[in-house]
Amino acid sequence: MSSIRFIACLYLISIFGNCHEDPYYQPFNKLNITLDIYTYEDLVPYTVDNDTTSFVKIYFKKFWITVMTKWCAPFIDTVSVYTSHDNLNIEFYTRDEYDTQSEDKICTIDVKARCNHLTKPEVTVQKEAYRYSLSSDLSCFDSIDLDIDLIETNSTDTTVLKSYELMLPKRAKSIHN
Protein backbone atom coordinates (compact mmCIF):
# COMPACT_ATOMS: atom_id res chain seq x y z
CA MET A 1 0.00 0.00 0.00
CA SER A 2 2.84 2.39 0.76
CA SER A 3 4.21 1.89 -2.76
CA ILE A 4 0.87 3.03 -4.21
CA ARG A 5 0.95 6.15 -2.03
CA PHE A 6 4.53 6.83 -3.10
CA ILE A 7 3.58 6.55 -6.78
CA ALA A 8 0.52 8.76 -6.20
CA CYS A 9 2.75 11.31 -4.46
CA LEU A 10 5.21 11.30 -7.37
CA TYR A 11 2.29 11.79 -9.74
CA LEU A 12 1.02 14.76 -7.71
CA ILE A 13 4.49 16.26 -7.55
CA SER A 14 4.81 15.99 -11.34
CA ILE A 15 1.46 17.73 -11.90
CA PHE A 16 1.00 20.10 -8.95
CA GLY A 17 4.50 20.52 -7.54
CA ASN A 18 3.78 18.79 -4.22
CA CYS A 19 1.92 15.76 -2.89
CA HIS A 20 0.03 17.37 -0.02
CA GLU A 21 -2.35 19.75 -1.69
CA ASP A 22 -4.58 18.69 -4.52
CA PRO A 23 -6.43 21.71 -5.96
CA TYR A 24 -9.10 19.44 -7.48
CA TYR A 25 -9.86 17.39 -4.36
CA GLN A 26 -13.52 17.12 -3.36
CA PRO A 27 -14.62 15.06 -0.30
CA PHE A 28 -17.50 13.31 -2.12
CA ASN A 29 -19.14 10.01 -1.16
CA LYS A 30 -21.52 9.52 -4.10
CA LEU A 31 -21.22 9.66 -7.87
CA ASN A 32 -23.81 10.44 -10.50
CA ILE A 33 -22.76 9.97 -14.13
CA THR A 34 -25.24 10.71 -16.92
CA LEU A 35 -24.53 9.86 -20.53
CA ASP A 36 -26.75 11.18 -23.35
CA ILE A 37 -26.07 9.67 -26.76
CA TYR A 38 -27.77 10.63 -30.01
CA THR A 39 -27.44 7.88 -32.60
CA TYR A 40 -29.22 6.36 -35.57
CA GLU A 41 -28.34 2.80 -34.48
CA ASP A 42 -30.70 0.30 -32.81
CA LEU A 43 -30.94 0.90 -29.08
CA VAL A 44 -32.56 -2.42 -28.17
CA PRO A 45 -31.72 -5.07 -27.17
CA TYR A 46 -28.82 -4.40 -24.83
CA THR A 47 -26.97 -6.18 -22.03
CA VAL A 48 -25.25 -4.74 -18.96
CA ASP A 49 -22.08 -6.13 -17.38
CA ASN A 50 -21.39 -4.44 -14.01
CA ASP A 51 -18.76 -5.64 -11.55
CA THR A 52 -19.88 -2.89 -9.07
CA THR A 53 -16.29 -2.05 -8.23
CA SER A 54 -14.52 -0.53 -11.20
CA PHE A 55 -16.35 -0.93 -14.50
CA VAL A 56 -19.70 -1.06 -16.23
CA LYS A 57 -20.07 -2.23 -19.83
CA ILE A 58 -23.24 -1.92 -21.85
CA TYR A 59 -23.46 -3.79 -25.15
CA PHE A 60 -25.81 -2.80 -27.97
CA LYS A 61 -26.14 -4.36 -31.42
CA LYS A 62 -23.64 -2.05 -33.18
CA PHE A 63 -21.78 -0.32 -30.34
CA TRP A 64 -20.79 -0.59 -26.70
CA ILE A 65 -20.12 1.76 -23.79
CA THR A 66 -17.57 1.30 -21.01
CA VAL A 67 -17.37 3.32 -17.79
CA MET A 68 -14.18 2.70 -15.81
CA THR A 69 -13.51 4.13 -12.36
CA LYS A 70 -10.13 3.99 -10.67
CA TRP A 71 -9.33 4.74 -7.03
CA CYS A 72 -12.84 6.04 -6.33
CA ALA A 73 -14.25 5.41 -2.84
CA PRO A 74 -17.90 5.36 -4.02
CA PHE A 75 -18.82 2.66 -6.53
CA ILE A 76 -21.32 2.66 -9.36
CA ASP A 77 -23.89 0.28 -7.93
CA THR A 78 -26.90 1.21 -10.08
CA VAL A 79 -27.36 1.60 -13.83
CA SER A 80 -30.54 2.89 -15.50
CA VAL A 81 -30.97 2.81 -19.28
CA TYR A 82 -33.65 4.83 -21.08
CA THR A 83 -34.17 4.72 -24.83
CA SER A 84 -36.33 6.83 -27.11
CA HIS A 85 -36.03 6.69 -30.92
CA ASP A 86 -32.54 8.11 -31.54
CA ASN A 87 -31.79 9.16 -27.95
CA LEU A 88 -30.08 6.99 -25.36
CA ASN A 89 -29.86 8.17 -21.75
CA ILE A 90 -27.85 6.12 -19.27
CA GLU A 91 -27.45 6.95 -15.60
CA PHE A 92 -24.64 5.38 -13.60
CA TYR A 93 -24.89 6.28 -9.95
CA THR A 94 -24.19 5.47 -6.33
CA ARG A 95 -27.27 4.50 -4.39
CA ASP A 96 -25.62 2.97 -1.32
CA GLU A 97 -23.51 4.72 1.30
CA TYR A 98 -19.74 4.59 0.77
CA ASP A 99 -16.67 6.12 2.37
CA THR A 100 -15.72 9.69 1.54
CA GLN A 101 -13.12 10.02 -1.21
CA SER A 102 -9.65 10.19 0.33
CA GLU A 103 -7.39 13.08 -0.62
CA ASP A 104 -4.43 10.76 -1.16
CA LYS A 105 -6.22 8.79 -3.90
CA ILE A 106 -7.10 10.43 -7.18
CA CYS A 107 -10.47 9.20 -8.44
CA THR A 108 -10.55 8.94 -12.24
CA ILE A 109 -13.54 8.25 -14.47
CA ASP A 110 -13.05 7.18 -18.07
CA VAL A 111 -16.06 6.78 -20.39
CA LYS A 112 -15.64 5.22 -23.83
CA ALA A 113 -18.27 4.78 -26.54
CA ARG A 114 -17.17 2.48 -29.36
CA CYS A 115 -18.79 1.56 -32.63
CA ASN A 116 -18.32 -1.94 -34.06
CA HIS A 117 -17.22 -0.53 -37.42
CA LEU A 118 -14.82 2.39 -37.13
CA THR A 119 -14.99 5.00 -39.87
CA LYS A 120 -13.59 7.99 -37.96
CA PRO A 121 -10.58 8.53 -35.69
CA GLU A 122 -11.04 8.46 -31.92
CA VAL A 123 -11.57 11.80 -30.18
CA THR A 124 -11.03 12.40 -26.45
CA VAL A 125 -12.04 15.29 -24.19
CA GLN A 126 -10.79 15.60 -20.62
CA LYS A 127 -11.37 17.71 -17.50
CA GLU A 128 -9.58 18.40 -14.20
CA ALA A 129 -6.03 17.30 -14.98
CA TYR A 130 -7.14 14.17 -16.90
CA ARG A 131 -9.33 12.82 -14.08
CA TYR A 132 -12.47 12.70 -16.16
CA SER A 133 -12.46 11.70 -19.81
CA LEU A 134 -14.86 10.89 -22.61
CA SER A 135 -13.69 9.27 -25.82
CA SER A 136 -15.34 7.92 -28.95
CA ASP A 137 -14.72 7.47 -32.64
CA LEU A 138 -18.20 8.96 -33.33
CA SER A 139 -18.62 6.55 -36.27
CA CYS A 140 -22.19 5.67 -35.27
CA PHE A 141 -23.09 8.57 -32.96
CA ASP A 142 -24.29 12.08 -33.75
CA SER A 143 -23.24 13.44 -30.36
CA ILE A 144 -22.41 12.36 -26.83
CA ASP A 145 -22.91 14.43 -23.66
CA LEU A 146 -21.41 13.29 -20.36
CA ASP A 147 -22.26 14.84 -16.99
CA ILE A 148 -20.37 13.84 -13.83
CA ASP A 149 -21.60 14.99 -10.41
CA LEU A 150 -19.53 14.57 -7.25
CA ILE A 151 -22.00 14.44 -4.36
CA GLU A 152 -21.72 14.60 -0.59
CA THR A 153 -24.55 13.10 1.39
CA ASN A 154 -25.16 12.77 5.11
CA SER A 155 -28.15 12.02 7.33
CA THR A 156 -29.74 15.44 6.73
CA ASP A 157 -28.58 16.74 3.36
CA THR A 158 -27.37 15.92 -0.14
CA THR A 159 -25.10 18.43 -1.88
CA VAL A 160 -23.63 18.41 -5.38
CA LEU A 161 -20.07 19.56 -4.72
CA LYS A 162 -18.84 19.75 -8.29
CA SER A 163 -20.25 19.04 -11.75
CA TYR A 164 -18.39 18.41 -14.99
CA GLU A 165 -19.72 18.34 -18.53
CA LEU A 166 -17.87 16.76 -21.43
CA MET A 167 -19.23 16.71 -24.98
CA LEU A 168 -18.38 15.07 -28.29
CA PRO A 169 -18.11 16.46 -30.82
CA LYS A 170 -16.55 19.26 -28.84
CA ARG A 171 -18.67 22.36 -29.27
CA ALA A 172 -19.41 25.63 -27.55
CA LYS A 173 -22.53 25.97 -25.41
CA SER A 174 -25.25 28.18 -26.76
CA ILE A 175 -25.63 31.46 -24.87
CA HIS A 176 -29.31 31.63 -25.84
CA ASN A 177 -30.52 28.70 -23.67
UniProtKB/Swiss-Prot annotation:
Regions annotated as coiled coil: none
Q: Name one Pfam family in it.
A: CrmD_SECRET
Kindly state which keywords UniProt assigns to this record, in alphabetical order.
Answer: Early protein, Signal
The region annotated as signal peptide is 1-21
Q: Which residues cross the membrane?
A: none
| Keyword set includes Signal | yes
Q: What InterPro entries does the annotation carry?
A: Poxvirus_TNF-rcpt-II_C, Vaccinia_virus_B7/C8
Family membership, please give it.
Belongs to the poxviridae C8 protein family.
Protein name stated in the entry: Protein C8
Q: Where does this protein come from, organism-wise?
A: Vaccinia virus (strain Western Reserve)
